[in-house]
Amino acid sequence: MAIKPILFNTEMVRAILDGRKTCTRRLVKPQPDEKHIFPLGFVTDSTEKKEVGCFGFAANEYGGSIQYVKPPYRYAPGDILYVRETWHKYTKRIGKGESCRLAEFYGYKASVANSEDAEEPWHPSIHMPKEAARIWLKVTDVRVERLQEISEDGAVKEGIYVANCKDCNAPFGCDACPDEGYEEIDEFAELWDSTIKKSDIDRYGWDANPWVWVIEFERCEKPEE
């Protein structure tokens, strides 16, 4: 078991806290070239130690040349992840009378109704120290697939929740529109593209159908170290 960080934006943190998000997709970087389109799996043992833990893409279904890609932080089933999220520190007066004192706390944007009212500035998730982590996850599965291979169930595990029909905006369960009025995959596609830089959308956007890491997880307690 290894303990590693993972970054989530504020909306995804809220989905995790609500119990709606149990999976995340991250870009495979670099993407395998056009000649290597057959995923083989993770290398568990090799005479080349640098290949262990990498994912292999073959030139054809029988093998041929192989291109190796290293996963982010080499996430693996059983690993424990601490979530890095948008955060800050703030002070609060506690106690009364002679016992009154100032104490310092960590605050999290995902748990604030109106983050604009915060007196202390928010810090990016990438700068959050491990000691501030409040959400811990256990990796249950890691695999590679094309982005558009995601299923409706997979989109739901990503935290997608369609409350209204996209055709008529009626509450979920209306009978006036066809089933395609509710499309979790469409919502996920929009969410995915919103996270990609405009300069990279042709390479990594939904329509480009890039290879992605699919990391499934469950909530867990902070481990003893």
What are these regions (language model features)?
Residues 1-225:
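Secondary-structure transition motif
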